[in-house]
């Protein structure tokens, strides 16, 4: 792939990692938003994700940063927020060869529990078919 997102592709998933050698989903979104568009996305640790208060504070910080949920069709640079079996998941909408998809860090583990996921680009419909649900699109004003 000859695209700016190629520098992230294939990097391994690691919990709470913010790059450049590994990412979790939030760390990847923060790095892409900062590196590509100069936007800040607040930190969200595993502890924050585990409580309603932590998630509410993160959502409030995102809104203070100029991000808002939109009902419009997604476009490059928007953030996808959805649910997975592990909880909340985020990614960035990216346009590659006239195809809009999601760049995200998948947290998959093998039978022994060893992380085997990583940064991938895939169509939203494929993500939804693989178990991600309740998609929301967030856009920076």
Language-model regions, residue ranges each:
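Glycine- and charge-enriched low-complexity intrinsically disordered segments
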Residues: 115-141
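N-terminal capping segments
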Residues: 1-65, 85-89, 132, 138-141
């Amino acid at each position: 792939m000859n695209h700016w997102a190629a520098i992230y592709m294939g990097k391994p998933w690691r919990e709470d990692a913010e790059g450049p050698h590994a990412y979790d989903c939030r760390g990847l979104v923060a790095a892409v938003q900062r590196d590509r568009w100069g936007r800040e996305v607040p930190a969200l640790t595993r502890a924050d994700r585990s409580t309603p208060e932590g998630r509410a504070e993160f959502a409030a910080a995102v809104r203070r940063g100029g991000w808002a949920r939109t009902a419009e069709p997604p476009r490059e640079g928007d953030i996808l927020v959805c649910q997975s079996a592990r909880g909340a998941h985020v990614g960035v909408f990216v346009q590659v060869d006239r195809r809009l998809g999601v760049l995200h860090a998948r947290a998959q583990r093998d039978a022994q529990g060893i992380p085997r996921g990583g940064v991938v680009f895939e169509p939203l419909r494929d993500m939804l078919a693989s178990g991600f649900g309740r998609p929301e699109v967030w856009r920076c004003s």
